[in-house]
Amino acid sequence: MINFLGTSKIETERLILRRMEISDIQKVFDHWLSDERVSDNRASAAHKTVAETSERVEKIISNYASKEFCWWAIERKVDRELIGEIDLYDFDITTGNCKVSYSIGYEWWNQGYGTEALKAVVEFGFQYMNLHKISAAHNTDNPASGKIMRKAGMVQEGIIRHMIRNAKNQYKDCVIYGILQEDYFKT
């Protein structure tokens, strides 16, 4: 049975995973949601206006009232810079399974922040929420995301053809990864 805890603050060696705040809107826009290099790996298009980002962040904040909502802003400890987001979603209470997704601003790619955030959320999911399985997917054009998933202990489970259609109206194949609670606790 899933122990829903909402979006609890999580700290790692270099990061603070915390709730989004209204004051984050400009940085969310500037650091990843308006950047096509990041949005090319997401299902949704890059934001053209801060108003789009504002609407999205306000919706996230309004969902924090639910214990079943787990969406973190990723902040660096060293300079309090907001660099990305990560969330657990699509909970199946029958199986105890869910999915995870994340976005990191381009400036912070290849510095280990995605891996560090994902490891922390996987730990939170298994240790505190009693999840059975956490799954993730990345499009085949983004193998760096698969590397993050593997470093967090996930294993490749397959490829789903044309799993998503991106903002450029292109179908993308996605690689599926997963990690089971029992495997997490073996390591």
For each predicted feature, which ranges?
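Acyl-donor (CoA/ACP) binding surface of acyl/acetyltransferases
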Residues: 1-27, 31-39, 58, 75-187
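Hydrophobic residues in alpha-helical segments
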Residues: 32, 42, 64-65
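Conserved GNAT-fold acetyl-CoA-binding loop/helix
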Residues: 37-59
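Short, surface-exposed helix-loop/turn micro-motifs enriched in polar/charged residues
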Residues: 44-45, 66, 96
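Short, conserved alpha-helical segments within structured domains
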Residues: 45-49, 70, 141
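A short helix-loop-beta-strand connector motif used in the catalytic cores of GNAT acetyltransferases and
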Residues: 60-73
